């Protein structure tokens, strides 16, 4: 995923590099945008697109390889997956190229991006666009109920990135151990009450990891009367006032956690293993299909099920974006448009492949294309669209940074 576990390092890295370049988007635009899609297709033929994407998930890597095969066969476009450990690698490469005056022929054609990395590129004039309105499949994007397709961590996307897939917080439990669905906790207070009845059977990843920090964000959303305040940057005063109820709640929860709240799994994979080993009963994931995919792959028992909170859960969109100096922008546009196609979106949503939530408004699709989604691999662990509900928007990124730092200060003192 583009948002990597090391929150402080990425934030400091991008902040330290931002003085190197200007903030005027117009200065970053070096080529004329063409609304003639046939011309774009023609120019793309024979190009090699260097798609810079996080490579930490083999299912995603396989999907990118499949998309490359499809583009080669249909449009004569070669896709090379530049495998990243951290999206900031690609961002800093574009920053360095701009600082060196390399305003064309750049080494990054397309990058999987969101969050602080997208904000940095958008603010610093590193993006080609607005590109989304030029793609034929942009008309299929859901901009009503999937608001994160338009707003990325409070930053308006404004067509400078193309939605690819959705993520949303879900909770996973083993129905063999929690057999009564009425006992499943669906709020922060119910989660605390459940933990009191079942001490040691709940945990969350370390908030130095993105998923652990998101657990804190989600619980804060549960406990504040107006989550809108978190759409603004956190200040010392607002953070202290707004986060107070969270820490009061967490001080009660922590002793009831796995290993007395003295140790935490490093990431989602480690937390999932604890569920599989029977050490805990509930986990969380940013992939609604995680339980279904893991059960199908033997990493979780077949009895796992998925639930969300009564007031909803946080969701965000992964995007692809084209740097301002991309050597093969036309090929990158063709790839981005293909990723929006019903064919690609349905394959990505199938738990045999990625299990990601689509970014489309299915009501806009012709019947034949809608049928692709009706034929997806079923699973009792897979939540329905109604189960997920409308995702809550991510708060401003400053809240995540402060929550992770404050948790560390309180926990390690």
Task: Show where each model-derived region lies.
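Conserved C-terminal helix/tail region of periplasmic/extracytoplasmic solute-binding proteins
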Residues: 33, 273, 380-413
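Early extracytoplasmic/lumenal segment of secretory-pathway proteins
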Residues: 31-119
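Extracytoplasmic ligand-binding site segments that recognize negatively charged/polar headgroups
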Residues: 54-66, 81-89, 108, 112-269
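Periplasmic-binding protein-like
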Residues: 250-253, 264, 300-321
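Alpha-to-beta junction loops
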Residues: 97-110, 126, 198-201, 277-282
């Amino acid at each position: 995923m583009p948002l990597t576990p090391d929150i402080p390092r990425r934030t400091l890295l991008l902040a330290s590099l931002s003085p190197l370049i200007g903030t005027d988007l117009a200065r970053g635009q070096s080529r004329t945008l063409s609304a003639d899609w046939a011309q774009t297709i023609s120019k793309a033929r024979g190009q090699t697109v260097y798609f810079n994407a996080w490579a930490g998930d083999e299912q995603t890597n396989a999907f990118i390889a499949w998309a490359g095969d499809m583009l080669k066969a249909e449009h004569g476009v070669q896709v090379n997956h530049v495998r990243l450990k951290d999206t900031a690698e690609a961002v800093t490469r574009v920053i360095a190229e701009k600082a060196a005056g390399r305003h064309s022929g750049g080494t990054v054609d397309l990058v999987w991006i969101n969050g602080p990395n997208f904000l940095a590129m958008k603010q610093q004039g590193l993006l080609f666009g607005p590109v989304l309105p030029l793609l034929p499949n942009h008309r299929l994007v859901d901009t009503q109920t999937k608001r994160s397709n338009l707003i990325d961590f409070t930053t308006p996307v404004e067509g400078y990135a193309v939605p690819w897939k959705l993520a949303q917080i879900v909770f996973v439990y083993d129905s063999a151990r929690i057999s009564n669905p009425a006992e499943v906790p669906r709020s922060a207070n119910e989660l605390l009450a459940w933990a009191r009845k079942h001490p040691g059977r709940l945990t969350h990843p370390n908030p130095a990891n993105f998923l652990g920090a998101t657990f804190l964000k989600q619980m804060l959303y549960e406990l504040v009367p107006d989550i809108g305040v978190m759409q603004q940057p956190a200040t010392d005063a607002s953070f202290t006032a707004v986060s107070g109820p969270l820490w009061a709640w967490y001080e009660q929860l922590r002793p009831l956690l796995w290993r007395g709240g003295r140790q935490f799994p490093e990431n989602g994979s480690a937390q999932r293993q604890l569920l599989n080993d029977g050490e805990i009963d509930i986990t969380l994931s940013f992939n609604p299909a995680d339980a279904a995919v893991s059960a199908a792959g033997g990493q979780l028992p077949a009895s796992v099920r998925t639930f969300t909170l009564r007031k909803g859960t946080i969701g965000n969109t992964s995007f692809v974006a084209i740097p301002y100096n991309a050597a093969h922008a036309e090929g990158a546009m063709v790839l981005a448009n293909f990723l929006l196609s019903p064919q690609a979106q349905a394959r990505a949503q199938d738990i045999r492949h990625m299990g990601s939530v689509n970014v489309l408004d299915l009501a806009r699709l012709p019947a034949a294309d809608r049928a692709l989604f009706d034929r997806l691999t079923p699973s009792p662990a897979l939540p329905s669209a109604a189960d997920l509900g409308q995702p809550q928007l991510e708060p401003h990124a400053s809240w995540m940074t402060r929550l992770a730092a404050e948790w560390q200060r309180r926990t390690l003192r």
